[in-house]
Amino acid sequence: MTFREWNNRKNNWLRAQKGEWAAKLLGRAPMSDAYNPQKVQKILLLRNDNKLGDALVSSVLLRGLKALFPTADIDVVAGKSNATILRNNPAVSTLYFATEGLASLISCGLKLRGKQYDLYLDLDEKPTLASLAFLKVLQPRWSFGFNRQQYPLYNLTTTMDLSVCHITARYEACLRFLGYQGKLDTSYEIKLSESAKVAAGQFLSTLQWGGGRLIVVNPLAASRHRSFSAEQIFGLATVFPNDTFVLLGQESKLRKWLNGRALLPRMVTFTSGIFESAVLAQQANVLLTPDTFWVHLACALHISTVAVYQGKEEFPYKGNIAVWRPLDPAVKMLLWPGEQKDVPVYMLAQVLQEKLN
């Protein structure tokens, strides 16, 4: 076990201990009548982790909630970053903002308490001290979470092993518990604006194709431990010398990643926003990424993609791979037991060539 893995386990354990302590301290949920879906008119979803990919995948849940409760208002507590994704979801009525900090969530809870929500949803694996305090202040009619038998503030719960099931299965289980019937659409959903399409089109018109293919690379993940190295991508460009490589990302982060390297002749950067970059990736022959947000985006838009994950080829999948792996056939998953920056260039080239063929 690496130090980083040990540290993550330690932090998860401490988080669980704080949550269990808070559950005992904060007491039970207010007395409520038996759950009745016909009485649900106001829903609040906690999505303040600020993760873009999680917000995108939440489109499955939000669409299902709107189908189950067509006249209800569905509000979301979000972070400043993932609001970019949630804001254009047609099922969302209003966004409210909070960090994962205790003070921020309590302040948000006090603000929203007067709305008297009928249904509160927190689908994280375990609640935190801050999220429990938020729930205590909010006092919704019904509050749902998985495996919350030891947390009396939740008056709706069901048991599920969240470490081995895909995130869409988690959302489906929640919706079924709440009363959803019939076939559930588990595809991801995102809307791309016309202005994004125009911006990407203008950029594409400036490229000198020369008969080659377009390979779009998102080299940077949320963590440096999951990002590609410049050496890898420059190495790939030499394997495919007749193709054009477009590097996606924020300008300052790409500059730091390049570390003074000059771009190769058939290599350019594209530093516009998420939606413009998504349109550009749609036009590519293949997208290469180590980042789960871009994997979810590729699934939503059916982009031909090679997604590099940390993990081992084993079945059944467990942990991060089990929960967040791509299910869309357009996305091929490459598993590597170490950090993504250590994947050999020849291995990346082989999988890219398979997709390009």
Predicted regions located by residue number:
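Catalytic machinery of carbohydrate-active enzymes
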Residues: 1-357
